């Protein structure tokens, strides 16, 4: 950690509730608020403890953290993530900390863990610790601004919610295949059919790609579900879903087709040149889409539908760390997320690797994996020589910078803390 080169990095305001402002940070970097307890004896100072990281995209900004109890000293540190810095990737990995499992027990106790088209849900799971519960091929997880994690659990035909106390609750679906009503109905009374796409707003409103029924459904903060639209052509494959906050624009995946829906124009194909789409995100005014079947990642112009290759050679091997993303095999790539400072996190299904592609297009191995491996809980996430993940389904980022990953046929949701470890 170092002072931003050539600047006077400083805290400009700090209140007791943890609202902090700063100036002269890196315009592409991370700021870390650290604290140290005031000494009880003269000269007996303790260690500086990282409290909160913030991505920085401007020299001056602000954020909020929870101050520790008691009298404290505070300081602000900064690192550069720009590709002009030779330490950019090192700075990124050192800004992340511990790997956790937050949901799933690997279908423990079942003779056929991780089997496709198998519903492992039991009524007794309701309200239990999420790490004691068997998931059924979960496909995507995303967090709201209150730190609740929503999971679309494909083969239990439901959406599950892990609350901040670590317990799991059904928030949509009846845990069996059905085609529930389209009008306003309590979400836990509405049957769905292999839902596998999800989009969550900060206030806890969420949207579900009810793939088997060819529908996009909404659940409001009162737990009421309505169908926004039904695709008359049906939805094949599914997975990718993105919803604008005013609900007037929705993009979703259907096999080879990337589709757009608006209230006035209905459903149209934006691009039909894919093999087997995975997840999608918005990047500026354009879309980024993964093609699991072609092992590639594309930028799609939302006005014309024209696509441009971003990452992937189409090969079926493992990635080569530190080399151009365009020349790399991204075997079964299906997850994608963009951090505030640019670049992309990509999650490979068959390759079982989580990678980061920096803004210069260089690929870096972030977390290694293999088949159905699952390891590393409670440890620093960056262990490239060890397999910590199984096959990956998705990656997303919450509003605090933590990474949420769905991995392994046997059903786990993991989190990597955006929290620097103490030195």
PLM regions with names:
Residues 154, 211-212, 253-255, 292, ...:
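Short loop/turn segments immediately following the C-termini of beta-strands
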């Amino acid at each position: 950690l170092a002072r931003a080169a050539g600047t006077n990095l400083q805290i400009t305001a700090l209140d007791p509730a943890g609202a902090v402002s700063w100036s002269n940070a890196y315009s592409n970097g991370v700021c870390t608020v650290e604290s140290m307890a005031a000494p009880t004896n003269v000269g007996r100072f303790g260690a500086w403890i990282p409290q909160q990281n913030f991505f920085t995209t401007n020299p001056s900004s602000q954020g909020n953290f929870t101050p520790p109890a008691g009298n404290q000293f505070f300081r602000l540190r900064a690192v550069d993530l720009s590709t002009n810095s030779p330490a950019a990737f090192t700075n990124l990995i050192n800004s992340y900390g511990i790997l956790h499992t937050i949901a799933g027990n690997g279908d423990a106790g079942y003779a056929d863990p991780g089997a496709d088209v198998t519903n492992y849900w039991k009524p007794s799971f309701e309200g239990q610790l999420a790490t004691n519960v068997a998931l059924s091929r979960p496909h995507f997880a995303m967090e709201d601004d209150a730190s609740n994690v929503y999971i679309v659990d494909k083969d239990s035909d439901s959406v599950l919610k892990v609350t901040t106390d670590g317990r799991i609750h059904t928030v949509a679906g009846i845990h069996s295949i059905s085609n529930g009503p389209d009008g306003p109905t309590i979400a836990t009374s509405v049957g769905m059919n292999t839902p596998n796409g999800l989009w969550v707003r900060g206030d806890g409103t969420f949207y579900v790609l009810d793939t088997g029924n060819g529908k996009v459904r909404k659940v409001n903060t009162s737990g009421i579900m309505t169908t926004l639209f039904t695709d008359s052509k049906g939805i094949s494959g599914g997975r990718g879903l993105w919803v604008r906050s005013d609900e007037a624009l929705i993009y979703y995946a259907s096999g080879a087709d990337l589709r757009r829906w608006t209230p006035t124009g209905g459903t149209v194909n934006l691009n039909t040149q894919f093999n087997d789409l995975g997840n999608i995100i918005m990047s500026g005014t354009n879309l980024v889409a993964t093609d699991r079947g072609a092992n590639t990642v594309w930028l799609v112009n939302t006005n014309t539908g024209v696509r441009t290759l971003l990452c992937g050679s189409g090969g079926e091997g493992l990635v080569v760390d530190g080399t151009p993303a365009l020349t790399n095999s991204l075997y079964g790539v299906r997850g994608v997320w963009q951090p505030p400072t640019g670049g992309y996190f990509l999650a490979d299904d068959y390759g079982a690797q989580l990678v980061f592609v920096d803004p210069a297009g260089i690929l870096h191995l972030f977390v290694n994996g293999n088949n159905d491996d699952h390891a590393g809980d409670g440890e620093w996430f960056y262990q490239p020589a060890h397999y910590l993940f199984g096959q990956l389904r998705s990656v997303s980022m919450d509003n605090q910078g933590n990474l949420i990953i769905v991995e392994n046929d046997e059903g786990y949701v993991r989190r990597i803390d955006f929290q620097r470890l103490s030195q």
